Amino acid sequence: MKRYILPALALSLLASSCKLDLTPENAITYSNAFSTEAELNTTTSTIHFYLDNCMDAFSPLTKIGLLADETQDDGQLREGNPRTIIQAAADWEYVYRMIFEANLLLDNIGKTQGLSEDRYAYHVGQAHFALGFGYFMLSRAYGQAVITANAKDLKLYGLSTQQQVIDAGIEHALKAFELLPTYDKLRTTSGNLATYKQYGSKGNSATLLAHLYAWKGSMAELYGDTSVDANAAYRKSVEYASKVINGETGAYSLVSTPDQLCQLLSDPNASNPEEIFSLVYDKSRGNESTSKNEVANLFATWPVNSTLTQGDLAQAAFRLKKSTIEKLYPDADDARRTAFFYEFDTDHEVSGVNYAVPYKFRNAVFTVDQSAESGKSFLSINANYVYWRLADVYLLRAECSAKLGDTSGATSDLNRIRSRAGATAYPAAGESDLKKAIFHEREREFILENDSRYYDILRNGYHRTELTGKFPSLTAADIAGGALCLPIPSSAQRDKDGKVINGLILQRPYWFRYM
């Protein structure tokens, strides 16, 4: 793998702070590294590697937001204990490694000889998609973050505001949307048509834009930022979501039933028409390689983990009670109850607790373990991390339409998802709050599957009612000071010996008091 001099991106963030091991010996390395497309491919592949491995930067918020009744080790984290969150030591290192590589490509692609217009668009489009996705994720999890101009300027960077980070994401996502083809026409670094939806395309760029604009408007409302026109942002979200739903950005469609969805999610090699963007489970990287879907692995238990028995249900990292699922799906005809949960109509009681047994992901990967009675040990759920699928876009459009007062449009999108599940259309008995109904529909649709719930809670302003522990009692000053975001990683300010390497980056006020 090539090595580059990190021009101090001095975002200490990227050098010492982000611990980037990318130090070229001289400028000649830059010139030589991009002279042919084969060399350019190395950088594009590195961007994809970091894109596939950056989710650890957001893990604490994923766990805080999950719908769960019990956890094995994360009770204090989910209660919002500041010191526990700080000790979780989430670090945005890999996100900024990805950002650096994307900027590096944009800085140097002009040196690549013999590059066709299509190949130029592919490589530049991948870089812009990665930058858009990276800044989107940073704006959600950390709020304030560093926006780097390029990979060559020697200077220190301070934190930008959340809205500035969102706007940076939008700027790059728009460029990716304009440059990239639909997924079916996408040719990767090998020159072959893409076989996995892990690459930037017109469809997932549009989905990224729909999420960025929804987040922009929602954060303006949450933080009372009157300089941002929230409704204009919601209209843009609806615009890009509609492009995806209407087939303008690729041929995506809802699968027929929740059970069929589970079968497709459980097969990394399946062609899932609902899938828009995924992080691929690459088992070839080693015997200890696991799925990027942390959520699916947190809920993994018997019977998918065949080394366990029903009596081990109480030992799963995250657990749900049957009563919680009955409340979440009040309609007994909702097919998601029996598709997403194993033998849902049968009780699975352990030590007096009747558990719902996760079954959305149905296959596992095991390693040989001669010391185990079964001769094997559970390694991972066998699944790609399908980060966005079409149902997400329908419900995001419904949410933004409801905020804009388009009750008819929001209801239609909500009921499209309910219809697939065989559930009663909105408004069902007792339903009168459309916005809350859409939020709960997202819970029903994405339970056990992804990290969306924490951010759904924030977009809708439900942090006082849907989160526990310290969250309901947070003051306006706490929230303005960063309480709903992760603390800025210490590596952004100091080296491994504690020496300050970037005095422009300051910890958010809420977190500073606990350090």
State the predicted function of each range.
Residues 57-66, 182-204, 218-299, 424-437:
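Short, surface-exposed recognition loops and adjoining beta-strand edges that mediate ligand/DNA contacts
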Residues 18-65, 88-89, 104, 510-515:
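Acidic, glycine-rich segments characteristic of secretory precursors and extracytoplasmic regions
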Residues 1-38, 169, 210, 398, ...:
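Bacterial Sec-dependent N-terminal signal peptides
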Residues 34-49, 74-145, 153-167, 171-188, ...:
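Conserved, well-structured interaction surfaces
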Residues 139-141, 146, 184, 215-224, ...:
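Short coil/turn linking the two alpha-helices of tandem helical-hairpin repeats
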Residues 35-39, 44, 48, 71-90, ...:
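Elongated scaffold/linker segments in the mid-to-C-terminal portions of large proteins
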